[in-house]
Amino acid sequence: MYTKYQIRRTTRHKAVLLEKKKKNNMEKMKDLAYYNGKITSIDDMMIPANDRGFYFGDGIYEAAMVFDYKIYALQDHLDRMFNSAAMLRIELPYTKEEVGALLTDLVQKLESSCQFLYWQVTRGTSPRNHLFPGEGVSSNLYVYSKPWKGAQMSDEYRLISIPDTRFYHCNIKTLNLIPNVMAAQQASEAGCNETVFVRDGYVTECSHSNISMVKDGVFITHPLDNLILPGTERKHIIRWCGELGIPVKERAFTLEELYTADEILVTSTSHPSMRAMELNQKAVGMKNPELIQKLRDKYLNEIGK
């Protein structure tokens, strides 16, 4: 018997697929971590202190849901991963197909069939220096997967808004998340679930989610640009709207418009349909439950629930 795929780099920084024998009676794991070919439990994984992810947050990441050992929207996550790497000029010594094969193999090793899967790539391991490492230093791939209770949906999301002071490359899924961390903490301390970023009068996104609204039967969401992350769930909702005959407008909208929206929908990979009922302590949305349910049904149908 063989495990399927394991990525390692050659001295020419090209990936090769290596098949590794395993015993028939190998037990499944509670959780799993992977780092450049080594597999352990999450708590036992050791990562070099000179990994540039520690010094500079010099890397990118992705997170996906796993249902019945199948990675939901895997291709979308791989496309975004490679786009982010290209924008940061991080060289990836493997193809999308190789990464996808590795991830697909890793999630099979856990006891739980429903998982939260995370992976990141950093610019490599080298002594601290702001400049890119020289030749001979290849990127590092870290993966972990753990049991998950499943994608979350709610009709009771509470939001606050703050100025969006992040940098102008929010379309890159970078490890640099301090503004998002601070914003998420601010929401929690206010007794809320998420923070809405507002830049120059316009709503952009949330601390770890996209945000959209429904007004007069039209689904309205911020256009893809450098101010928001191209969310995978956002992408699929737009597709589902097309299938359901729901008009879509990709345009910037103001906080004032959000207050008067018929529905406010906060979306992410792990929280695909969070319906907001409060914004800055004011009641909002909750006026078109039928439309929201249609979108939720599309999601549940796709994950096989």
Where are these regions (language model features)?
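Cationic, low-complexity basic patches in intrinsically disordered or flexible, solvent-exposed regions
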Residues: 5
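Short, Lys/Arg-enriched N-terminal segments with co-localized hydrophobic residues
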Residues: 9, 13-28
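Helix-start/capping segments and mature chain N-termini
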Residues: 26-108, 131-305
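Ordered, amphipathic secondary-structure segments that act as subunit-interaction surfaces
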Residues: 109-121
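Short, internal active-site loops enriched in acidic
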Residues: 122-127
